[in-house]
């Protein structure tokens, strides 16, 4: 009998596909998508995304479709139960966080309050 461990943050299929495409484009299989939270933005905190080759002590990793999402411990507390997604629309394309912990968000969705 196998036991499944719940992941602290979801990594959507769309986000994993886009990360995979970007990693292949860069021809660097060591790249991982790192999501983080910093102070700032119009609502108090803001999300950030970067590609990183390193996983630091204490980081949480979520693997999906041969790519990895990385979250540092400080950011994870604000992202628990959320989802990293990717969207393409009239406003352009971007990674975003669907965060159930956010009590308010700004119009662009890049900053939030808890």
Swiss-Prot record:
Keywords: Iron, Iron-sulfur, Metal-binding. One of its GO terms (molecular function) is 2 iron, 2 sulfur cluster binding. The keyword Coiled coil does not apply. One of its GO terms (cellular component) is cytosol. Binds 1 iron-sulfur cluster per subunit. Iron-sulfur cluster binds at residues 42, 106, 108. GO terms for biological process: iron-sulfur cluster assembly. It comes from the Bacteria. SUPFAM superfamilies: HesB-like domain. Its cofactor is iron-sulfur cluster. The keyword Iron-sulfur applies. InterPro entries: FeS_biogenesis, FeS_cluster_insertion, FeS_cluster_insertion_CS, FeS_cluster_insertion_RrpA, HesB-like_dom_sf. PROSITE patterns: HESB (PS01152). Required for insertion of 4Fe-4S clusters for at least IspG. Homodimer. Belongs to the HesB/IscA family. This is Iron-sulfur cluster insertion protein ErpA. It comes from Pseudoalteromonas atlantica (strain T6c / ATCC BAA-1087).
């Amino acid at each position: 009998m196998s036991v499944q461990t719940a992941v602290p943050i979801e990594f959507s299929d769309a986000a994993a596909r886009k990360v995979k495409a970007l990693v292949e484009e860069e021809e660097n299989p060591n790249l991982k998508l790192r999501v983080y939270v910093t102070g700032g933005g119009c609502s108090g905190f803001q999300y950030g995304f970067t590609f990183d080759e390193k996983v630091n002590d204490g980081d949480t990793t979520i693997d999906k479709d041969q790519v990895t999402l990385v979250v540092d411990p400080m950011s994870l507390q604000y992202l628990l139960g959320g989802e990293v997604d990717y969207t393409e629309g009239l406003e352009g394309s971007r990674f975003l966080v669907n965060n159930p912990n956010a009590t308010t968000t700004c119009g662009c969705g890049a900053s939030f309050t808890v």
